[in-house]
Amino acid sequence: GSSRFCRFRTRQGEVGVHLLIAPRSSGALHRGMRSVLPGFGVVWRAQSQASLAARRPICCTSRPRLHGHGNHHHAGFGKTVGWRAAEREAELPTTRRQAEIERAKKLGLEAASSIQDRDISMMSRGELPHFAGINTFMKAPYVEDMKNVGLYDAAVVGAPFDGGTTYRPGTRFGPQGIRKISALYSPYNYEMAVDLREQMTLCDVGDIFTIPANIEKTFDQISNAVGYIAASGAFPIVLGGDHSIGFPTVRGMASVTSKRIGIIHFDRHADIQEKDMDERMHTTPYFHATAIPNVPPTNLVQIGIGGWQVPREAVPNMRARQTNIVTMNDIEHLGLEKVAEMALDAAWKDADAVWLSFDIDSIDCAFVPGTGWPEPGGLLPREALKLVGLVAKEGLCGMEVVEVSPPYDHADITSLMALRIIVDTLGTMVAHGKLGAHKPIIDKPWKPL
């Protein structure tokens, strides 16, 4: 015989068991089930020999015997997020997962006859194994033809540029680092009860051709790429790159809509100087982004600002433009929920969409050593994830994660945190039906610079 994982419905809900298929008789099946699952009582209806030979799972109900509590776990656990997530998983489809398995077997050929799991192919062509395969983001399809990007709900694009950094370089390798560690993740999140593979379509379009020795030409390339992706209807996800790209990304988004855009910006630094070293460096993006007519500074919210790396030259611009600033002390005093509420109120006030810019250095440098301007005293990882989830619930028109510098990282933990910010954002929007909500604001054709 052989085993198969099956899902069965009981009076208490669905359960999954490994079912032994014995191509002889129901009696043999019963004895096999008792040997594999001694804690289960099994009720079955007679199956024909033909159905057994076809390896169809027997329709049955199961009654787990759970340590003196009858058919129920401890009453208090029925109300936990953990148990509700387990129940909600049963509602998720598995169609695309199965299609991916079949595609892998078709393209990668069938596995050796010695391998019992016939869902495995000879060549790695899908999600598994996590240590193999080509490093696209989350092993999403690589779309070389940009004309096809609109076929997907979201598109990942790399902006490998560190020509705007003023201290430690290396963020040009950020997109590679994030893609590499993204192989670690599956598309399913237990707590959210979200499966990105089943509930959305994601692609990776590769990297923008940046010009290392020319900031302005690189900015034009980035604006064109983001504008094109947004105009196609796909949700743009930009992998930085230093934070100088925060200006051209917003410019690209703003170029394909007449609507008003707000910005929620996580950072330890204000990034609102007009110039730094006579150029538009990574300390300047929001001076220039908020000069765009449909991106007013009063809709800019900056979360986590503070410490010893905020240049005084930036502060008069914050006052003059009336931006909305939240320090770490504010977060500690007000709490995460209140800060998120204030951020949403300000960013969305008279706005039609919100762009998310997440600088990885907003997180305490003990957790993200791989960045250009590390600063102690920032957000803890769970605080960052909580805040991102709260602001993403209302929907976004695009996002970027910047300042990941793999040469200064340890064991990929900074890249991993950047990855988590992205997938939590996507998962939150999927869970709340907000992915794609930006499409109605796209009312202008894409015009390259």
Feature map (PLM): residue ranges:
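Conserved small/polar residues in nucleotide/adenosyl-binding loops
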Residues: G1-F5, M399
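Conserved alpha-helical scaffold segments that buttress catalytic/binding sites
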Residues: G70-L449
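N-terminal mitochondrial targeting presequence
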Residues: R4-R7, G16-G70
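Hydrophobic alpha-helical membrane-insertion segments
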Residues: Q12-E14
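Aromatic-residue hotspot detector
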Residues: S2, I58, T136-A140
